[in-house]
Amino acid sequence: MIRIAIDVMGGDFGPDVAIPGAAKALERHNDVTFLLYGQKSKCDPILAQYPALREKSVFHDCEVSVSMDEKPSQALRRGRYVSSMWRAIEAVKLGEADVAVSAGNTGALMAMAKFCLRTMARVERPAIAGIWPTLKGESIVLDVGATIGADSQQLLDFALMGGAMARALFDIDRPTVGLLNVGVEEVKGQEEVREAGRLIREADLGTIDYRGFVEGDDIGKGTVDVVVTEGFTGNIALKAAEGTARQITTLLREAISRSFFAKIGYILAKSAFDVLREKMDPRKVNGGVFLGLNGIVIKSHGGTDAIGFASAVDVGYDMVHNGLTAKIENDLKIYHARRLPPPAPEALVADEE
């Protein structure tokens, strides 16, 4: 049984989205139980509408919640130990839950997750990994906002963790990985990116298939399974892609409504448009994964609806079901074991004596 802790008060719509979203996820996964953290007075009337969810849930009353515009430092001081966000994360730390899901303030969620769960041994900075629809299916892009200006060693860590996530999510033995750059030539790009490419190549990581540098358009093409970048660039790429998807949807809607014949054409091609809409629906790939922590935390978009929140719960379920944390820990252990210097000759002699 997989145990999922939910910050019910997080996001723009709080329990109005989180509770129906959890109920939708429950319809797809009958081997889960939920730990719901929120304000009882606001949640009880909504939870009463979903008896199946209520039966599979334990509710924890939390009068304190984190607002979407609250500074991370302020949220940590005010909400530590008592807020719905903190207590959902803490449930993972205490072993009461396998994963925490929140649509709340990203900065506050990362601050609380780092403070409560701590980073894995030898991981300098955590990353947020997003799932990206591509022409070939889906890919993983990280970091999309956790670490601004990552150095070469941190980018190598991201490659390892992203590869582990791809194996957990896509069931790929050796996922392909590329470093996002301004060109595919080895002489291009910032020094940190070029150095990261050298480190990954020389490390000869058996868990991933490093394909070198990739460009921005390679993300949508699905050129590689995992695209690695630092948080500033990754977040801009993510927001640009989301904006482009909304722009295309708006332009199509305007074009269809422009004339009678355009409407007839839409009716004739409706099935094709439905496929396009399904493919470009950001709710279907909602759920950023915090990688590099001693526990799994999923960040849902704050403005999503119940369908999108259910997708974030699905991601959390898949990460637990496929052993994400163990995969990352194992890959990091193998990599760092290879980096250890060989024992000195005198040490070998002493051991033999």
Curated annotation (Swiss-Prot):
Instruction: Respond yes or no to whether keyword Cytoplasm is given for this record.
Output: yes
What's its top-level EC category?
transferase
Q: What pathway does the annotation place this protein in?
A: Lipid metabolism; phospholipid metabolism
Catalysed conversion reaction: a fatty acyl-[ACP] + phosphate = an acyl phosphate + holo-[ACP]
The record's subunit annotation is:
Homodimer. Probably interacts with PlsY.
In terms of HAMAP family, this protein maps to:
PlsX
Write out the similarity annotation.
Belongs to the PlsX family.
What biological function has been recorded for the protein in this entry? Catalyzes the reversible formation of acyl-phosphate (acyl-PO(4)) from acyl-[acyl-carrier-protein] (acyl-ACP). This enzyme utilizes acyl-ACP as fatty acyl donor, but not acyl-CoA.
The identity of this protein, by name, is Phosphate acyltransferase
What organism does this protein naturally occur in?
A: Agrobacterium fabrum (strain C58 / ATCC 33970)
